[in-house]
Amino acid sequence: MVVKITDKMKFSRSFDYVDNGIEHGVLSKFEPKEILLKKGTLIAEGFKPLDCDIKMLKDVPVKLRDGVTIYTDIYLPNNCKKVPTLIAWSPYGKSAGTAPRYKNLFNMLGMGNAWNSGLTKFEAPDPSYWCAHGYAVCNPDMRGIAHSEGNTTMVGSQEAQDGYDLIEWIASQEWSNSKTALTGTSYLAFSQWYIAAEQPPHLTCINPTEGLSDGYRDLAFIGGIPDKNFIERLQVNHVSAKGAKRENLVKEMDCYPLATAEVWKDKVADTSKITVPAFVIASYSNTLHTMGTFRSWRNLGSKEKWLRIHDKQEWPYYYDKDNVEELRRFFDYYLLDKDNGWNKTSQVRYSLIDFQGNNTNDISTGTFPPSETSNTKYFFNPLTRTLQDNAGKTDVVLRYDTQSLPGKISFQKTFDKKTTFVDYPKLKLYMEVENYNVESQRKTRHGVKRI
């Protein structure tokens, strides 16, 4: 008997779906139809007018390989040309650009909402801009989201197969030039690793902007430490669906604490299987996505790949006007066959962070880490609380109380000349818990104890 990975997952009832045209955006009510949105239209107060006429195909059904039907919104230039498609895969609601929760979020960040048209799915490309430049934008509700059938899973092979099916469906449509790309930040980035690894024939290129690639190591047990808080918030942000179930990662953390569990192994992206061109965006400061983005970049099977390491938060970076223009050069080259010189772009560009605010950006190099860097080891000096070049000759025990301030031990290093840190930092620690009875066990993957 073949056991599907979904049989191993733990599910809970989805949250109730509110279909009032407000909670999930002004265009969220279920109304399968074609709408002509005229240039200059204001989708909602506080957003910018549309850049061009857009044909909106609303709540279009797409049948997946197992018979489940999902629904997607598709935005097209209002002409008869065949166009490439940008796909934004996520569980956050295909029409939620004007939802109060996201309007408030971007206001809180100081970005406001006038940078987009209101058609923009959370963390996704703005259809107004891309339709004006000859692209279609596909905003699907994945299975178990809003009116899409089935139960929602989070990260892994089920989503990857569904994304594959959507890509191949798009390629068969009369308005499609058969070329597609995946783009977006965060969830819309890490879903790309999984979908692209399935190698859909009509996926042309990808643009992951900061995305984890291992559901266990990057999300649930970061550094081996359980982190249920963010997962709970992530699951709450999933748009719900009436009568559906959602995968409950918190329950799975309790049931499957080891990375060897099938559920967690299914959530590891094999980016070596990705062969399409990739424009990968990373940063040093995203505790959720940094490790997975760099790991994926290193392991990518793509022969044509670019890495840009920026000095901002992912959303201001992704929606910055100049960065959008550069992304269009990448897509124009592969999706519209424009000979715009993108292939001559430096394979790696990185930033240097200066704590006085004088950051240096877009330093070009052929590899990352840059070939001119050298790995340097530093050792703790427990007596001076500094870092030194050589290991000490005597062992010294340092203690701190986790229940009182400062709750940490710090070490400093003062450099006598200008020094730049570029590369993946590594730290090896030896720690011991005192005055506790500790029981050590080792288990096989089948749960058999070995003492």
Residue ranges and their predicted role:
Residues 30-40, 104:
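Short beta-strand/loop turn elements enriched in aromatics
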Residues 41-343, 347:
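Active-site-proximal cap/loop segments of hydrolase catalytic domains
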Residues 2-32, 44, 312-451:
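C-terminal, loop-rich substrate-recognition/catalytic regions characterized by aromatic stacking residues
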